[in-house]
């Protein structure tokens, strides 16, 4: 015959399992969003487009190191309610030396609908690119490395960041953590070949 404590444990196990599951589900619901869960939000109305290249198409040479090396014109639309500022990161994951950051910009005013070529909206702060300089650095892949993808990531944030212009991408991403309302990605291509 089994002891009373054995039956108490056997009967109590399902109750403990239900309680643990409930606690885990509540913790997951209340946990702050991570960059991964936030940046997968392409279903919002936020959009980033350019008049000079379509998503997945070639970036004109004038916006690269083989041209004027100025940022391409961009249009922003569908900024979600609650947005306090926008941020932009442009990088090349195909770079020979690893992911190369071409441009970071933040505290872009939410009323911004256009980022004109070779300019940024008033109040916008530009950070350090992978060349160690603040501002835009156009695509410049070495010959023989094929077509590179230039990822333009636009973020809608629930706060202004107030970071200094010596901030790099990693510091920018850390500051955005938990404050991303929506994201949209525009991809441009460029090849030296």
Task: Set out the residue ranges of the language-model regions.
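N-terminus-centered regions that define maturation/targeting leaders and the start
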Residues: 4-193
């Amino acid at each position: 015959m089994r002891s009373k404590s054995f039956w108490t444990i056997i009967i109590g196990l399902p109750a403990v399992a239900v309680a643990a599951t409930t606690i885990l589900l509540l913790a997951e619901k209340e946990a702050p969003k991570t960059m991964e869960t936030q940046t997968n939000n392409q279903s919002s109305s936020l959009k980033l487009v350019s008049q000079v290249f379509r998503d997945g198409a070639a970036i004109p040479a004038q916006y690269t190191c083989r041209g004027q090396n100025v940022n391409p014109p961009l249009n922003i639309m569908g900024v979600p309610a609650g947005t306090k500022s926008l941020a932009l990161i442009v990088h090349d994951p195909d770079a020979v030396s690893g992911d190369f950051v071409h441009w970071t910009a933040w505290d872009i005013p939410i009323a911004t609908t256009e980022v004109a070529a070779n300019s940024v909206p008033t109040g916008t702060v530009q950070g350090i690119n992978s060349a160690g300089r603040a501002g835009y650095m156009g695509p410049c892949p070495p010959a023989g490395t094929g077509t590179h993808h230039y990822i333009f990531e636009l973020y809608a944030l629930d706060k202004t960041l107030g970071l200094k212009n010596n901030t790099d991408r990693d510091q920018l991403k850390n500051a955005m953590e938990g404050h991303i309302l929506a994201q949209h990605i525009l991809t441009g291509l460029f090849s030296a070949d």
